[in-house]
Amino acid sequence: MIFSTLEHILTHISFSVVSIVITIHFLTLFLLVDEVVGLYDSSEKGMIVTFFCITGLLVTRWIYSGHFPLSDLYESLIFLSWGFSLIHMVSYLKFKKRKNNLSAITAPRAIFTQGFATSGLLTKMHQSAILAPALQSQWLMMHVSMMVLGYAALLCGSLLSVALLVITFRKAIKIIGENNNFSFSFGKIQYMNERSNVLLNTYFLSSKNYYRYQLTQQLDRWSYRIISLGFIFLTIGILSGAVWANEAWGSYWNWDPKETWAFITWTVFAIYFHTRTNTNLEGVNSALVASMGFLIIWICYFGVNLLGIGLHSYGSFTLN
């Protein structure tokens, strides 16, 4: 009873704090008042509080349930939110007193995942239950934690690539919207990519353009680093899952929906790294691949659970 109450309290504290953090962050982003009242620093400290609250929540549920809290969709969403908070913590320690643009990605992701986890759709999963026989293995912690951390890092890196594309093609998108012409061929993308590369040489003429160039370079650099980390986690998760599957079901790979989409996700980001090796394809083109990867990850992590079929059906839920 005590652990259940503590878990409930920590859940609401972390959700409330991260909500305040997002509000503060957008105030500092659009009103530019962080230099006056120090709101930006307050939002960073708020994410630290959120990180420790979610950590306490996971530890409490671990003690209360007697197993590592990654047995269903609810627990994995909480762990995913913890992963976003962890990435934010690492970037905060990296930047220290400099402004950290990554918080614009991690904070909304944390509140989105935790908000969905605590919603009425997953009420039946809020109470910890006896671990399913298929999950009673030491591989649970290794496999699922690596996969979820990989999802968290890849989602953050992909959103940074989306932000890069928005900044790069903002004027082109505005023109297309005004003309009500929504056809957007790869030829146009290639043209705009070449045009943007030419414009990079003239950015020094305007301080605003120079700042935009610096921002896109920073987004591209951080996107590559975070996606690299997520790709490593994803690879370890897939390999450990294959070993676990062989022990549990006698086969390393069964091509059920979850495994198939995990392989598709891995392939998409392998293509992303291939584009990074070619100087003519890196930048905008690699960001396009990463942006597609963002959708693929959500299908792999969440969309497949809606099917409720396959060897991973124990983590699924149905919309009533």
UniProtKB/Swiss-Prot annotation:
Classification via NCBIfam families: cytochr_II_ccsB
Entry's Gene Ontology cellular component terms: chloroplast thylakoid membrane; plasma membrane
Gene: ccsA
The UniProt record lists the keyword Chloroplast: yes
Family statement drawn from the similarity comment of this UniProt entry: Belongs to the CcmF/CycK/Ccl1/NrfE/CcsA family.
Keywords: Chloroplast, Cytochrome c-type biogenesis, Membrane, Plastid, Thylakoid, Transmembrane, Transmembrane helix
Subunit structure as annotated in this protein's UniProt entry: May interact with Ccs1.
Membrane topology: Multi-pass membrane protein
Localization per Swiss-Prot or TrEMBL: Plastid, Chloroplast thylakoid membrane
Regions crossing the membrane: 13-33, 46-66, 73-93, 147-167, 226-246, 259-274, 289-309
Functional description taken from the UniProt entry: Required during biogenesis of c-type cytochromes (cytochrome c6 and cytochrome f) at the step of heme attachment.
GO terms, molecular function: heme binding
Protein name: Cytochrome c biogenesis protein CcsA
